[in-house]
């Protein structure tokens, strides 16, 4: 078959060249309109701003509009909110409250063609988290805890040390007093017991130790004084 192999080799190059020329001459205006994925839900706190985006592959001439499906009324027609602001069709809701809850849907349309619609983003409005009584950073909290530990250690060590020194001083003082009492008790250590008994006999005099009170009248009884 004349010219068969050469024709087969030139066929892939021709197809690639035609595809490249069609992509260059047609440009983005002849491409199909499609949209990027959007987040399924968006959570904001009460009083904050909510930002919705509608990314798509269309040119700047595309018309982006936003619609809201009311919460609990999905069978009703969606509520028109207005056009998007930038090329991504961003919708900003300021100072969000509970009434802004619902599903937000964006529509992109080029000219008279049919529009493309996103799957929708559900807006959830929550109460702001309670602020702590002492709104401090982690570094400040760590420094406060360190200072508290030092103060507790000081309060535990200093009184205990003072009590130990006081107890030691009392023990030393009691030791000295006990030594003085021991010396006072030994003042008469060198006296003779016979001298002590002689002194006792002299103090008693010639009176007997016992009296015969049976032969005396009651008025004449004289008892020995100790």
UniProtKB/Swiss-Prot annotation:
Q: What does the UniProt entry state concerning the protein's domains? A: The transmembrane helices of CD79A and CD79B chains and two IgM heavy chains assembly in a four-helix bundle structure that appears to be conserved among different BCR isotypes.
Main location group: membrane
Question: What does the UniProt PTM comment say about this protein?
Answer: Phosphorylated on tyrosine, serine and threonine residues upon B-cell activation. Phosphorylation of tyrosine residues by Src-family kinases is an early and essential feature of the BCR signaling cascade. The phosphorylated tyrosines serve as docking sites for SH2-domain containing kinases, leading to their activation which in turn leads to phosphorylation of downstream targets. Phosphorylated by LYN. Phosphorylation of serine and threonine residues may prevent subsequent tyrosine phosphorylation. Arginine methylation in the ITAM domain may interfere with the binding of SYK. It promotes signals leading to B-cell differentiation.
- Report the leader peptide range: 1-32
Q: Which CDD domains match?
A: Ig
Question: Membrane topology type, per the record?
Answer: Single-pass type I membrane protein
Please state the gene responsible for encoding this protein: CD79A
User: What function is annotated for this protein?
Assistant: Required in cooperation with CD79B for initiation of the signal transduction cascade activated by binding of antigen to the B-cell antigen receptor complex (BCR) which leads to internalization of the complex, trafficking to late endosomes and antigen presentation. Also required for BCR surface expression and for efficient differentiation of pro- and pre-B-cells. Stimulates SYK autophosphorylation and activation. Binds to BLNK, bringing BLNK into proximity with SYK and allowing SYK to phosphorylate BLNK. Also interacts with and increases activity of some Src-family tyrosine kinases.
Q: Where is this site: Required for binding to BLNK?
A: 210
What does changing residue 156 to W do?
Answer: Blocks IgM BCR assembly
Q: Topological domains (Cytoplasmic): residue ranges?
A: 166-226
The residue ranges of the ITAM domain are 177-205
Protein name, as recorded: B-cell antigen receptor complex-associated protein alpha chain
Q: Which parts of the sequence lie on the Extracellular side of the lipid bilayer?
A: 33-143
Q: What is the effect of changing residue 152 to W?
A: Blocks IgM BCR assembly
Residues bearing PTM Asymmetric dimethylarginine: 204
> Oligomeric state and partners?
Heterodimer of alpha and beta chains; disulfide-linked. Part of the B-cell antigen receptor complex where the alpha/beta chain heterodimer is non-covalently associated with an antigen-specific membrane-bound surface immunoglobulin of two heavy chains and two light chains. Interacts through its phosphorylated ITAM domain with the SH2 domains of SYK which stimulates SYK autophosphorylation and activation.
Organism name: Homo sapiens (Human)
Clinical condition linked? Agammaglobulinemia 3, autosomal recessive: A primary immunodeficiency characterized by profoundly low or absent serum antibodies and low or absent circulating B-cells due to an early block of B-cell development. Affected individuals develop severe infections in the first years of life.
Q: Which GO terms describe its molecular function?
A: identical protein binding; transmembrane signaling receptor activity
Phosphotyrosine occurs at 188, 199, 210
